C-alpha cells in the first residue's frame, strides 16, 4: 500500500507500536487478488497504479514473484522503479495454462508478499476464489495481468492497465 512521506516520517512512538501499525497496514492487503486488464495504448497506467504498492510490499522481508509470459524482466527497469532487486524473483512461464496453478501454489506458501501472473483468459469465479483463498493462507497479494484483445469487447467494465514492454529485454 502506498503511504505519503508524511505517514513514513519518524515518530516518537515506541518501535513495537510502529511495527504493529506497519504490520496492520501490510495485513490489510493480505488476501487481495486483483485483475489488471490492459490495452497496448496505455503503457504508463500500471506503473502509476501498481508501483507504489509494489514498492511498499518490497519493504517486507519476503520475495516478489513475477510469473511472466516468456519475457525476462529488465534489471535496469526493476532498479529504476525502486523495487528491491534482491527480492524480485521471476519465472518465465512457457505454458500460460500453468500460470494459475503456479500462482495458487506460490501465494499459499507465504514466501511472497506479492505474486504477479499474466493470463490470457478471464478467470472463472471458482479460479478467482482459489486464488483469494491461497492469498489469505499465505498472507499475500496477487495480481493477474490480462491483455484485452483489440477486437474483443469485455463482458463487464474493466480498468485498462499495462506494464510497458520496455520492462523486458
Swiss-Prot record:
<feature type="site" description="Essential for degradation by Lon protease">
    <location>
        <position position="169"/>
    </location>
</feature>
<keyword id="KW-0132">Cell division</keyword>
<dbReference type="GO" id="GO:0009432">
    <property type="term" value="P:SOS response"/>
</dbReference>
<comment type="function">
    <text>Component of the SOS system and an inhibitor of cell division. Accumulation of SulA causes rapid cessation of cell division and the appearance of long, non-septate filaments. In the presence of GTP, binds a polymerization-competent form of FtsZ in a 1:1 ratio, thus inhibiting FtsZ polymerization and therefore preventing it from participating in the assembly of the Z ring. This mechanism prevents the premature segregation of damaged DNA to daughter cells during cell division.</text>
</comment>
<keyword id="KW-0227">DNA damage</keyword>
<feature type="region of interest" description="Lon protease binding">
    <location>
        <begin position="162"/>
        <end position="169"/>
    </location>
</feature>
<dbReference type="InterPro" id="IPR027417">
    <property type="entry name" value="P-loop_NTPase"/>
</dbReference>
<dbReference type="Pfam" id="PF03846">
    <property type="entry name" value="SulA"/>
</dbReference>
<comment type="subunit">
    <text>Interacts with FtsZ.</text>
</comment>
<dbReference type="InterPro" id="IPR004596">
    <property type="entry name" value="Cell_div_suppressor_SulA"/>
</dbReference>
<dbReference type="InterPro" id="IPR047696">
    <property type="entry name" value="SulA_enterobact"/>
</dbReference>
<comment type="similarity">
    <text>Belongs to the SulA family.</text>
</comment>
<dbReference type="InterPro" id="IPR050356">
    <property type="entry name" value="SulA_CellDiv_inhibitor"/>
</dbReference>
<dbReference type="GO" id="GO:0006281">
    <property type="term" value="P:DNA repair"/>
</dbReference>
<dbReference type="GO" id="GO:0051782">
    <property type="term" value="P:negative regulation of cell division"/>
</dbReference>
<protein>
    <recommendedName>
        <fullName>Cell division inhibitor SulA</fullName>
    </recommendedName>
</protein>
<keyword id="KW-0131">Cell cycle</keyword>
<keyword id="KW-0742">SOS response</keyword>
<keyword id="KW-0717">Septation</keyword>
<feature type="region of interest" description="FtsZ binding">
    <location>
        <begin position="106"/>
        <end position="112"/>
    </location>
</feature>
<dbReference type="GO" id="GO:0000917">
    <property type="term" value="P:division septum assembly"/>
</dbReference>
Amino acid at each position: 500500500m502506498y503511504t505519503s512521506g508524511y505517514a513514513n516520517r519518524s515518530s516518537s512512538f515506541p518501535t513495537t507500536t510502529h511495527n504493529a501499525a506497519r504490520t496492520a497496514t501490510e495485513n490489510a492487503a493480505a488476501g487481495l487478488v486483483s485483475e489488471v486488464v490492459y490495452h497496448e495504448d496505455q503503457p504508463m497506467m500500471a506503473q502509476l497504479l501498481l508501483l507504489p504498492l509494489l514498492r511498499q510490499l518490497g519493504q517486507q522481508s519476503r520475495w516478489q514473484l513475477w510469473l511472466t509470459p516468456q519475457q525476462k524482466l529488465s534489471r535496469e527497469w526493476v532498479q529504476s522503479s525502486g523495487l528491491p532487486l534482491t527480492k524480485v524473483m521471476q519465472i518465465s512461464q512457457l505454458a500460460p495454462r500453468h500460470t494459475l496453478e503456479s500462482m495458487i501454489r506460490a501465494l499459499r506458501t507465504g514466501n511472497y508478499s506479492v505474486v504477479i501472473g499474466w493470463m490470457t483468459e478471464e478467470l472463472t469465479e471458482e479460479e478467482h476464489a482459489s486464488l483469494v483463498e491461497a492469498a489469505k493462507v499465505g498472507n499475500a497479494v496477487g495480481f493477474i495481468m490480462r491483455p484485452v484483445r483489440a477486437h474483443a469487447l469485455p463482458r463487464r467494465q474493466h480498468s485498462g492497465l499495462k506494464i510497458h514492454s520496455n520492462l523486458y529485454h
